[in-house]
Amino acid sequence: MSNIHVRNNLDAPHAGKDSPLYKMIAGKTGAVSLPSLNMLDYSSLWSADWWGFDSCPVYANLSVEKQNDVLARCNQSLLTEAYFIEKSGLAYSAKMVLTARNTDEAQLFALIGADEAKHLAWIEPYVSADAKQLPRGHFLSFLSNLIEEYPPKLLVYLVQIILEGWGLDHYNRLAKSCAHPELAKLFAAILKDEALHHRSGNVLFDASQLSQRDYSLIEDALQHYSLMVRVGPQGALAIVDEVAGGLSNSDLQSVLVALRHEDETQRKLLLLRQLMNQPLVSRVVEILDEEHCFLPVSLREAVDCFVSSR
């Protein structure tokens, strides 16, 4: 089992409705009614108020066309990220089935994999063909590294307890605020399945079986994850900067204020800490506390992070 290697092939082709397999997949997953991407107004899916742009001077000074472009791109980024997360779930489930310690675990992970395939079929029609070939962002790279390199006993904690738990909050926010009724219903349905995935992680995780190396691997992963959260909404910031044609550092800080970087990032970090703080893993959380991993970086530091990767 130790020789099993699974690759999270995020850029693998995905033909969707153009595939000869589509009717079978759609029939099994219920993904029968397809939205027309040409008719879908991405800028209306989540509002400027939801993002915080309604209080952003930089956004207010853009033309209506550019404001809509910002909203459309930001909203598309939510759907594209969800697409690749669910796609990653296929690789995760495959690895966990192949390395399961018993038939019960193999059954569970096969069922989780079926859920991920279903979610992927639901989201895929809302994502353009080009976007499906372009996995972007540090989080997707981080998730792929976990799935490909980390042992199954740690993945139960890092993926199912922490990332799936994080996903419950994220999908709940998307479902409650989405202005597209079918898409809102879709995210609400995904939320129910993800809750089961998260709970099963709590059942399976046994920290008493962890070695010192396991704890070191967990600490390294959690440091990376918390850092990605600490720097705030870098993706949305990049979209505003690109549409506006390049912003000054003070304008970038203004956008981060509107995006509620300090308050919302702090809320997310506290949630992350709560999910991490499982029995016998509390020492790792204490170490991260000592390293200030659950505090947002300042506005200036968040802007510096963005500018350095421009």
Kindly label every feature range from the protein language model.
Residues 1-310:
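Non-heme di-metal
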